[in-house]
Regions:
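C-terminal transmembrane helix end/exit motif
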Residues: 1-9, 41, 163, 192, ...
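Interfacial transmembrane-helix starts/ends
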Residues: 16-20, 66, 99-116, 120-128, ...
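Residue-level signature of transmembrane alpha-helical cores of multipass secondary-active transporters
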Residues: 18-34, 67-70, 74, 114, ...
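Short membrane-interface helical motifs at transmembrane helix boundaries
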Residues: 120-138, 196
Length: 229
């Protein structure tokens, strides 16, 4: 009886250690990400003023990009999120069962379908940017930003899929770490570029951010799935 009790205690301690090993790093990186994200939003209008915009115009342009155009670009990614979260338990189950072949097959299909979906929407958004801006905002002020930012849809959606697959494959810490690194890179770009090229600095930062995030996640997925399996 004592040996069984000791074994149960050891199992509980081992389980607790595993939980702490996962949750503590994720909690720390989550806090860092939240703080960096707030700082990023704070410096954009300040740097636009440094570029030469009056404060009111700086806030206005910031609002057009981040508050109006960018949320439109985010809609396809939000649609993807509604089912991509279901990939976490699915891939966790496949990993536990050692079903490597099915993991690879599903990954390939998901990336192909997501790419087709994203590229189709990019074409629609770019072609109908004026109509979208008029319908939603009753002006054309955001149409150029919608058109310029539309290609980001592809990287956002693919990154969403890659991140949730990685979480299912017990790589949630890596996902959070890449998000923190991404924010640091974005802040550096915003800090140094906006005072020299204004709005262009924001556009470049958004592109670098999304491309880096997807590339890092995909390379991690490649190492975890395609290379090792």
């Amino acid at each position: 009886d004592k040996s069984k009790l000791w074994q149960r205690t050891k199992n509980k301690i081992s389980f607790t250690k595993k939980i702490i090993k996962i949750t503590v790093p994720v909690f720390i990186t989550s806090c860092l990400r939240s703080g960096l994200s707030t700082f990023k939003k704070f410096i954009i209008p300040i740097k636009l003023v440094a570029y030469g915009f009056p404060y009111t115009i700086a806030l206005s342009e910031y609002g057009k990009i981040i508050g109006m155009a960018f949320p439109i670009i985010m809609i396809p990614n939000m649609c993807i999120s509604s089912f991509s979260n279901l990939l976490v338990p699915e891939f966790a189950s496949l990993l536990a069962n050692g079903n490597k072949k099915r993991i690879i097959n599903i990954c390939n299909k998901l990336f192909k379908i997501t790419s087709f979906f994203s590229i189709t929407l990019i074409i629609i958004f770019m072609h109908y940017s004026n109509e979208i801006s008029l319908t939603l905002f009753h002006n054309l002020e955001c149409s150029n930003y919608i058109r310029i930012l539309s290609p980001l849809i592809l990287f956002m959606c693919l990154d969403n899929i890659a991140d949730n697959i990685l979480k299912g494959l017990d790589k949630q810490f890596e996902v959070m770490l890449y998000n923190v690194i991404d924010l640091i890179i974005t802040i550096i770009i915003l800090y140094f570029l906006i005072p020299f090229i204004g709005i262009g600095g924001i556009i470049i930062a958004l592109y670098v951010s999304e491309i880096f995030n997807f590339s890092a996640s995909y390379l991690e997925l490649y190492k975890k799935v395609f290379k090792n399996f």
